[in-house]
Amino acid sequence: MSKSDYYELLGVSKNATSEEIKKAYRKMALKYHPDTNPGNKEAEEKFKELSEAYDVLIDQDKRAAYDKYGHNAFDGAAGRGGFDFNSGFSGDFSDIFNDLFGGGFGSRGGRGSSRRSEGAAGSDLRFDVEITLEDSFNGKKVPISYVTYVKCSSCSGSGSEGSAKSVQCNTCHGAGSVRTQQGFFTIERTCHVCNGEGEIIQNKCKKCSGSGRVRDEVNLLVTIPKGIESGNKIRLNGKGEAGYRGARSGDLYVYSNIQKHKFFTRSGPDLYCTVPIKMTLAALGGHIEMPSIDGTWTKVKVPEGSQSGDKLRLKEKGMPVINSSKRGDMYIQITVETPVKLTKKQKELLQKFDDEPNVDCNPQSTGFFQKVKSFWKDIRSN
């Protein structure tokens, strides 16, 4: 049966760089690897073809020979101008995958036949807590509850009943994995007898069935530090999933989510708010009373002639800087409110005010219309 073109197998052009070939193989190998397709013979054959293609195209000498002679370069026919590479693919899957994936497949993260596999470490866990802005300002202790694997109290995580000892697995001889030869290729898989442990417990703990861990509810009191922001995480070492047979436990990551505040918005340690003021206060100036996140009230001066969009700054009236004694600032943005539903007398007074000749009274609008007049004058002159 004729072989598929190596370039077509990997989905790359004949001018592909080594990086492009490596990237293409990585993508295809993840899809067809036997560990991700258990019992799928078609996927296994596809994976063999991909690995053979990669082994040839990633090597400059082999690739040059393949480009010149095609598959004949590897049939041992050197006398006919071929190129003998000991049947083409001479490598080991684990060599390729260690190079590409750092031992993620086959070798079980580097725990191959050189030594017995250790117990699998517990997974890290995530827990989200929702707090108020005031909680972030003051700091808080938050009770949390979650269900996960915890160390078995009966066997203290060993998986053995009483003083029972473990014996070496006769299938993998303590390696934790077994290798099978299929044609040119060597495939390494986790030992199905000992599940990669390399040893078998003679008398398993009845409570945990030899795993050294059981599912249970965990209750903790988490300290939320002052100044924490949404998306910040708190790491609790060893509070994640318990490891298999006494292996290292995972960590717990508590993520904070701060509720939307009815008055303040936040950017880092600084707080922002928008305050509407009367037109007369903006024009004449004065003072307003402003609440702070710490529960106090502050008298704030509004300068004469304030405009919408002007900002007033209150130093160190913002949020605490996390793990520091400093605080951010509070910014008050002014919005000048236009009066509505005026009485007849109020309208007359406003009209009288507007009729008073004072070019400096409304500098923005006066300056704007002067620019408009100048604009039209320039157009007409052209």
Curated annotation (Swiss-Prot):
CXXCXGXG motif repeats lie at residues 152-159, 169-176, 191-198, 205-212. GO terms for cellular component: cytoplasm. It is found in: Cytoplasm. Zn(2+) 1 binds at C152, C155, C205, C208. A zinc finger (CR-type) spans 139-217. GO terms for molecular function: ATP binding; heat shock protein binding; unfolded protein binding; zinc ion binding. Binds 2 Zn(2+) ions per monomer. Residues 5-70 form the J domain. NCBIfam families: DnaJ_bact, PRK10767.1. This is Chaperone protein DnaJ. The gene is dnaJ.
